[in-house]
Swiss-Prot record:
It comes from the Bacteria. Its main location: cytoplasm. Homodimer. It comes from Buchnera aphidicola subsp. Baizongia pistaciae (strain Bp). The keyword Ligase applies. The gene is asnS. This is Asparagine--tRNA ligase. Gene3D superfamilies: Bira Bifunctional Protein, Domain 2, Nucleic acid-binding proteins. PROSITE patterns: AA_TRNA_LIGASE_II.
Amino acid sequence: MKTVSIFDIYLNKIKLNSKINIQGWVRNRRRSKLGLLFIDLYDGSCLYTMQVVVKDILSNYDSEISKLSVGCSINVFGVLISSIGTKQKYEIQAKVVKVIGIINNPGSYPISSKYHTMKHLRNVPHLRSRTNFFGAVSRVRNYLFNALHEFLFKNGYYWIPSPIITGLNSEGAGDMFKVSILDLNNIPKNKNGKINFKKDFFGKEAFLTVSGQLTLETYACSLSKVYSFGPIFRAENSNTRRHLSEFWMLEVETAFSNLCDIIKFSENMLKYAIGIILDKCVIDINFFRENVDEKIFCRLKDFSSKQFFQIEYKEAINILIKSNRFDHKVMFIGMELSSDHERFLVEEYFKFPLVITNYPKSLKAFYMRVNDDNKTVSAMDVLVPGVGEIIGGSEREERLNVLDRRFFELNLNKEDYWWYRDLRKYGTIPHSGFGLGFERLLSYILGIKNIRDVCPFPRTAYKADF
């Protein structure tokens, strides 16, 4: 007897009156006066449940089946038929029901009722994927992940695994998690009283990466088109709906390319991925239309069909000043755009995805290429409504003398970056790249305001229980 998924059935891959085997968890159950038990079975393959009709004549009906409650797992052998009910298209007439996992105290099951607040579900991330909401998030996340890989593969990019542990801070800033095996109760010290990291595992300070960009550039300077896709870590104690301490980043590096190239490429990539979601995830997107954002289909179709707006940083500042929404006394060329500034621009002024380019070099990292004015860098950020920045990118500084000057200006030791400088010594090339915050993109697509609700096990300050 063939084991099938509920999704296979709704894709019409299974013929009616076929003998099948289906497995999953009880989502709901109800008895009839005719000696029948109706079980709504859920297996995670899609949003739908499958109604299983069980007669009380089965040998284990009284001893096991009648005691089933929400969350119990079962294995059903039966016949697939058209349902005579109006709430479902199919049902299974059960011939055998094997109880796999019972819940002895149904009242203790944390997600037994039909509705729970997000606050409650954030406290049970190990179980919340069993709800419709988080099941749908997980399926869309999977399709989005694969769509991005697919787009890059079709465009000739090679996936390169970037290291999780590093001795450098790619952004030239702090907020990094340290990696150490030193005994916290007996930390070795130097004569000057500082920690002796030579006694540590790597013989020097080591951190969890905040970006794989620098190492990825080494392969861009040989394979031309490369990307990495994996977790990165930031020890920012930012308790906001937009920040996580561990999140996934897609980083793309392209040889012989400029800022215009990566702006166009990143926009095409986003549109391709969202097109896949609209094509492959209709059932789940419709769930979010009914429960989160009623305009989700229109919003995503507009995103896929219309060109992004594009302005320079200085124009963004002028728009903010003229809006009279912000204090003129603290608005000036060279200031950093806050999340409120970004949201005004993308949600109220342009009301559509926006690319901002040519930021002051004082606001950006050492590796971004300095423009001819020596005041700005050839950089870009992509902002989307409801989320803010989802992509940051730039041309990379390929001129060794300019790169060394940036190290000096930012008080960075260029010797720490000796291998990065080698790329400029030996056959340097113009190249560009960008990083995409995966969870932020998923938040935008689904219209979910809190980034913790699109991540299976969100890591934030004081939250690492699982």
